[in-house]
């Protein structure tokens, strides 16, 4: 009988293939005294140049495969390799102690790694991994060591590793890489996000999978359930070969839903839309058959720049998107702060940055920055269907202030004779419990709501979703959260306003029947999830989903809801 191991289901898909175990190179970096300081600095500079060349090449590969948003990760990596403060410290150490370049770089980068990895802010935790990735690349070049090039894999394998860096994941070719398993990581890590974009099955957080598996072992994985199977017998192999074939056939069957409307079995119409963060991602929306864009994350225009983008730069980007999409495109205004930083603007240190000066709180305070964005969005509305929504709204006064500011920008454009859609919809994110509880009052002023479940879960359960010690509190099917969603939807519908959802929950097959039953109007998800969601929706009767929703609202625990949903899905025709 096979041995089963459970990890974090990070990217769906079923695979059966031989393992390729990639162990992290253990660099034996010894402190050595050197006589030629200048030569050592030259070695460092040459290694940095080679590393930047590597990263630019990987960035171009990523740009072609996955678009601008994912490729932007390597801008950050190049910034680290080029960081003058880090280089200055390394050079100073070489000069002062007359030590070898690799030892000096390892010492300095390790100090930064330790400092950042101990911080609570997920942004800095992520940066610590980036620093480690880049510094090891530079050190490898100093030592003349071969760097693993995963793009050269030319046979079907499942990669086993402690972790996969963004630069490694970007090189994977799904023709040969049938999946990957790692000791660490979770659904929101770079590796998981890349895997979903590449449509490569992945299970993370397996703790010691590199010790349990050897290269060439035959293994199976189910990226939907998070199950890995080892020590397969003949029956197990046949079973998984059948599962793989069924999965391939299912993906082929889903293609017929591309040009179909999103309907329940009893012909109730809903919308299934896509989330994107870059103008380069528009093609994936068109290919997916999504009925619009429920979330365009505008902050990537800011994060990929070395300055606040001008009104004209933003206008061109927004216009490019709405002119290609025939359905509504909802733009979230600048959601910066918390885990999202800008290289050219320093936020003050805060005890709780996720609860601090961010999103709408920042833009209402910095109306000079906000004005460029609102004017650009209004101007773009003349070229397609466009909605504007404000993030992190906590009070009605905040929403009124933001909406009034839009009206002031309209008056300016009128005076200048610049065209825009005067009926552009103005909505808000519901990601703070106060907004959900008072949704019926907010609905008097907002044209629509979009529920951001990632933050709503985090704020409802007072738990950092990036902190593994409290990850058990990430409970999207907890009845308390479902009641907040129900309050939001009923409050909006009371005033004939529509409600969408743009968090990960919108694309979750377990959540979909409940959200249908709660009468959610629009489901916005990653483009790769659209057809699967539309297919599932077509099998569900709205009347039965409403009965399910009423039952789960009376539950006490996440587990009880899970059981009801599993029974419901298992009984679909």
Curated annotation (Swiss-Prot):
Q: Which reaction does it catalyse?
A: L-histidyl-[protein] + phosphoenolpyruvate = N(pros)-phospho-L-histidyl-[protein] + pyruvate
GO MF term list: kinase activity; metal ion binding; phosphoenolpyruvate-protein phosphotransferase activity
On whether RNA-binding is a keyword of this UniProt record, the answer is no
What are the catalytic residues? 190 (tele-phosphohistidine intermediate), 502 (proton donor)
Anything known on activity regulation? Irreversibly inhibited the sulfhydryl reagent N-ethylmaleimide (NEM).
Tell me which EC number(s) this protein carries: 2.7.3.9
Alphabetically sorted, this entry's keywords are:
Cytoplasm, Kinase, Magnesium, Metal-binding, Phosphotransferase system, Sugar transport, Transferase, Transport
| Gene Ontology annotations for the cellular component aspect, listed alphabetically | cytoplasm
**Which superkingdom heads the taxonomic lineage of this protein's source?**
Bacteria
Q: Which GO terms describe its biological process?
A: phosphoenolpyruvate-dependent sugar phosphotransferase system
Q: Where in the cell is it found?
A: Cytoplasm
Query: Which residues does the annotation say bind Mg(2+)?
Result: 431, 455
Q: Which cofactor does it need?
A: Mg(2+)
SUPFAM superfamilies given for it? Enzyme I of the PEP:sugar phosphotransferase system HPr-binding (sub)domain, Phosphoenolpyruvate/pyruvate domain, Phosphohistidine domain
Q: Does the keyword Aminoacyl-tRNA synthetase apply?
A: no
What positions does the entry give for phosphoenolpyruvate binding? 297, 332, 454-455, 465
Quaternary context: Homodimer.
Kindly give the NCBIfam families that the UniProt entry links to this protein.
PTS_I_fam
Domain description from the entry? The N-terminal domain contains the HPr binding site, the central domain the pyrophosphate/phosphate carrier histidine, and the C-terminal domain the pyruvate binding site.
PANTHER family given in the database record: PHOSPHOENOLPYRUVATE-PROTEIN PHOSPHOTRANSFERASE (PTHR46244:SF3)
Instruction: Kindly give any further remark recorded in the entry.
Output: The reaction takes place in three steps, mediated by a phosphocarrier histidine residue located on the surface of the central domain. The two first partial reactions are catalyzed at an active site located on the N-terminal domain, and the third partial reaction is catalyzed at an active site located on the C-terminal domain. For catalytic turnover, the central domain swivels from the concave surface of the N-terminal domain to that of the C-terminal domain.
Q: What does this protein do?
A: General (non sugar-specific) component of the phosphoenolpyruvate-dependent sugar phosphotransferase system (sugar PTS). This major carbohydrate active-transport system catalyzes the phosphorylation of incoming sugar substrates concomitantly with their translocation across the cell membrane. Enzyme I transfers the phosphoryl group from phosphoenolpyruvate (PEP) to the phosphoryl carrier protein (HPr).
Q: Which family does it belong to?
A: Belongs to the PEP-utilizing enzyme family.
Q: What is this protein called?
A: Phosphoenolpyruvate-protein phosphotransferase
**Provenance organism:** Mycoplasma capricolum subsp. capricolum (strain California kid / ATCC 27343 / NCTC 10154)
Q: What is the gene called?
A: ptsI
